[in-house]
Amino acid sequence: MKKWVYLFSEGDMTMRNLLGGKGANLAEMTSIGLPVPQGFTITTEACTQYYEDGRKINDEIMAQAMEGVAEMEKINGKKFGDLKNPLLVSVRSGARASMPGMMDTILNLGLNDEVVAAMIAGNPDPAFERFVYDSYRRFIQMFSDVVMEVGKKYFEQLIDKMKEEKGVKYDVDLTAADLKVLAEQFKAEYKNQLGKDFPSDPVEQLKLAIEAVFRSWDNPRANVYRRDNDIPYSWGTAVNVMPMVFGNLNNESGTGVAFTRDPATGEKKLMGEFLKNAQGEDVVAGVRTPMPIAQMEQEFPEAYAEFIKVCETLENHYHDMQDMEFTVENKKLYMLQCRNGKRTAQAALKIACDLVDEGHKTEAEAVAMIDPRNLDTLLHPQFDAAALKAATPLGKGLGASPGAACGKVVFTAEDAEVWAAKGEKVVLVRLETSPEDITGMKVAQGILTVRGGMTSHAAVVARGMGTCCVSGCGEIAMDEANKKFTLAGQVFNEGDYISIDGTTGNIYAGQIKTVDAQIAGEFGRVMAWADKYRKLKVRTNADTPADAKKARELGAEGIGLCRTEHMFFEEDRIAAFREMICSDTVEEREAALEKILPYQQGDFKALYEALEGNPVTIRFLDPPLHEFVPTEEADIEKLAKAQGKSVETIKNIIASLHEFNPMMGHRGCRLAVTYPEIAKMQTKAVIRAAIEVQKAHPDWNVKPEIMIPLVCEVKELKFVKKVVVETADAEIAAAGVKLEYEVGTMIEIPRAALTADEIAKEADFFCFGTNDLTQMTFGFSRDDAGKFLNAYYDTKIFENDPFAKLDQTGVGKLMEMAIKLGKPVNPKLHVGICGEHGGDPSSVEFCHKIGLDYVSCSPFRVPIARLAAAQAAIAEK
């Protein structure tokens, strides 16, 4: 019989694939002797089985779970569902990768009217009675919300109404009698919403709760988070069942969340929050704003001293910063969870360097422990120092996720999406965020919440996304119904500007200028380590000297893609280019192109100068001509006048350029075949610029790489290459200099990959244009795929957007085939990638595996690619 259930005493940290992260760490803490309430874990395989069985828990799994309950009863001396000495449990999810706020928790399971009455009868203390009713109403509320999907808001409204009637501000101020009434109201609300009574049998409660955790693996929030974080659907989640310890028992109890180092800065100091007389959910959900962890020392000196020891033990054991949840019940400490803590990119770099300096990690291990995707956030804007000095903060919350944000106020995630789609920059202002808000949080420049601490949902999710966040600004008076809030006497309506500083927590009215980030010393240190290990070169996609300069600062070793068409759109050149398009004869076309030549030459010269002898790959004209022609009446008239043609004639030419499927139309090398004069002009510009820069800097190795786009047949490449080589050689001879250059091609049509052995005979290099290669392989266009991709995610046909994360099974197979066919024919062939995928870590890893020479990505993703390339090389060892 298969083992579906493991006691905490039966597992360890190596079993996270089976027990999930939380279960494996609870087992590990048990094995090193830390105070963990002893329970059991239902495996991730049971979750997969649940889905295979049509979303049902089979009898075998349930029977093993009940055996686990019996073991818990033995260890704890209490009985599940017993009236005299009841065992109450918590049910929590735990996937193998941490997914904050995505999966749901149920506390105090096992309570019903009889158990509650018996518990109170056995202990006449009024404080105990209050505790029992508090635990009961929490259980009904959580069970209804998480297991039965009755919205939390119905219960929150009842609590708010009760507090109003009693004239109190906090839940803790409600009496036992108030909470007893609330529990009755909650059960009535449950029946009203679902048409059946609240389940009173603890075994039924447990089964429903386990099913709910498994079910939540497939909730929309979990699916979005998984897609953003490369977590496969097939992993499933485990379920952890453990005896309750009560932080809300009395004033000798409490609950907290802590980090062994500061998750925002990485500084080596204990950082966290503690709430007296509360349950864990209160801290994480951010309903009450807690006190800093250091204050716990005054309240519970013995438990605090033990906790400090536990922190040291865990950090020395895991060799990484730990995020821990704990409860104190009657002054006794219990550990409920530990995991490697989520951290900002700044903190990740500092912690990695410190762990190397402290002897916990090697350089290679330090490089491997940083998530490359988070490096993006280091390059985030900060407020301009002078503008900041002149501004006065209106209020202050907690600086929960660094960076500076400025935008228009919106009050719901839906509004954030609508406004952002119109190109507006928005700041999402909420009482507190919940996992349902994730889509709005993703598009916002920043997030501001009234409630919640540094470990609330808003804070954790914002840090993960690299979005600026200020949480827990209790001075804000919120009026969600009318979409406005008041702070320091000033009213902010939807659409008003606000600026927030996620580092200091300051909130400002109006707009404050932001500036690009400065990169700290640890960044350079970690990047130097990464460069030591990686084998892949990293280039950038850049069309302007400014982009190229930025990319060089971030460590780019060349330009892997310069798109020449962007240079045609500038005011002074577009007119000449339009004349070329509307010309009738080769001579007319050549005359128009002659006007553009000096501009192109100047552009290339500036790029060569910015790269100081590092390689520059220049892609010849790619888009279809209709993209360049005028659409406005005035522009059409201007063009007609310049060419001495009638407006009618010009309009006819424009109409003739219309294509039904321009993506597969008259573009790329097809333009150079029909209009070789375009390729001639571009070649002259490339070679003349190179000669000029070579003369000025004889110590640089200026070697142009000319790239012919959209080749699908070797004869096309031969034809265009002949034009390029004849033109280039004539230019070099005329100048009386020596200059080496290369002619290569983009591999972006499946047929090019399939016939790469033929094409390699004519090409000096291949560069995979994976944006087009993905479109052509899947047969859907990048601009239209958005209409149906969401349905594909919902139905699990796709788990990822193939335009963001390289499809390794299909597109990847074509790439591998092209390399295997091309290299034997032309051993000198060098191969790169220049689609958007060049900056995606999992795609970079794949490129390393199949033997590419370089990846090329946008300037700000260069550090991501450098780190991902190093991690791929380290993992291979």
Which residue stretches match the model-derived regions?
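Structural motif
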Residues: 240, 410, 427-429, 448, ...
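Nucleotide/phosphate-binding sheet-loop regions of phosphoryl- and nucleotidyl-transfer enzymes
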Residues: 1-391, 418, 424-427, 434-439, ...
